[in-house]
């Protein structure tokens, strides 16, 4: 295995029956990369993560961390990973402080300085009773526990789900700071925007299978630009459609088209549009969400 590859998943399959599970999943994550998982509920994000951590034995295929097979050798690398689960269930302890101390003992951690910095950044009160903690406080406590020993790998399963917008930003600022320090990060999320603003690449899962692995740089720097144009009358709409433009979406009921052009040809488009009566023209940004909908063949809303 390439020494620069930290996590490798090779034809991983875990079949729960009734077409539920993951099937022939393959990808790799290099040192220092931040990779996102996105997909509908039940698409296999959590199952893949649990296989990587050695919590679930696959029916077929393997996953590796630092070149060590997950199911057989997870004990040799698990302490080098910071993990934030999708469903946080604390042990029967009184406070967040008690939980963090128990984690420190498990990790044989004696220096609490990094944990204290994280507590301050996240404005967390660890003395709060675990059972009375809000969703946000539980997420913060879990993140501190995952990062307190300064691991090289961080794996998080939808860590910001249920957080209010301000807390989500605060949480992701900490994650981005870890990425900037060179940490290798795998994070699943329901938020396309969150992944687009933080990841190097994103893996799309649908019905337990990978349908696309997208580079964020390629999405942001694609050579085409898309424009939505609405005409005031049917005649102009039909006349424009007869021109040599790539129409990627046609909505005749609104006299509206979306065209894709090569960057640098905007002036040509504007010249061609001068003779028509327009209601509006606007650029349609190509986002991670649009890419996923295109791959998954999901129709965009108006």
Report the location of each language-model feature:
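ABC transporter nucleotide-binding domain
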Residues: 172-260
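Residues at or immediately preceding the N-termini of alpha-helices
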Residues: 70, 74, 112, 216, ...
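Generic structural marker for isolated residues within well-ordered, non-membrane alpha-helices
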Residues: 100, 115, 216, 267, ...
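ABC-family P-loop ATPase nucleotide-binding domain
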Residues: 1-13, 298-302
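Short, charged/small-residue-rich alpha-helical element at the C-terminal edge
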Residues: 225-302
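ABC transporter nucleotide-binding domains
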Residues: 5-7, 14-206, 212
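Residues that scaffold the ATP/ADP-binding catalytic core of kinase and kinase-like folds
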Residues: 73, 219, 291, 295
